[in-house]
Amino acid sequence: RIPASAAALAGKDVVTSETFTCLYGWRKWGGKGPHQDEEQVADMRLIADALFANGTNQIIWHGMPYNEKGKGKNDNHFYASVHVGPDAYFKDQLKDFNDYMTKVSQYMRKGQVYSDVALYLPLEDSWMGVEYPDSLQMPWVWGEYELRYVFAPDYLAGYQPLWVNAKVLSEATFTEGVLRYGAMSFSALAVDVEWLDIAALRQMLRLAKEGLPVVMAREPKQPGKNKSAEFAALYKELMALSNVSSRPTD
């Protein structure tokens, strides 16, 4: 959802993803990765469909289709990719799979992006969180700064929220009852974070004063070592407005 949100806000039509990297994990050094050369199209389709469901409309193969003449996948390989050469494990399914991804990508580029709610991206949470717990770490994933496990809250299901950040809020306008940024418009702003930069809070207050409905699902804290007394005052002023609520289901 993050790259799809960025594309919509920037007015871009194509959302790409380098796909199928380290499909079953990887080996840190030497040799092939787990089940390399045994890749299943069924597994790759699960990944492709998940990307499509989150707004991707252009799959880029992270594959290795070439080898020196007369040599095969056992002579030359890249540990993080899927082998898609003439001796690929799934060569008989490759064309149909590519055709499927092409067709879905074409459909995904039709029409206009729709969203009803702007959702504040918890970037400050990722900076303050530092490391993921062991249960969420992988050999190539350790830090919250990567935003790999950031999801829209369940109470926004059906509203098709797009992520926005402080820059978007600072440049957005509230006119004719909607929040506008580029070609996108939103009827409300939802904020569900533990930490919030004071600059973003100022923009939220500005827009709320202009009439934008705002949901502050949690009371955020100010990140960083140096705190400002203004933060609490701004938050109090924001929550006193009639168009600002702390109850997402209202």
Task: Give the residues covered by each predicted segment.
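Carbohydrate-binding surfaces of carbohydrate-active enzymes
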Residues: R1-D250
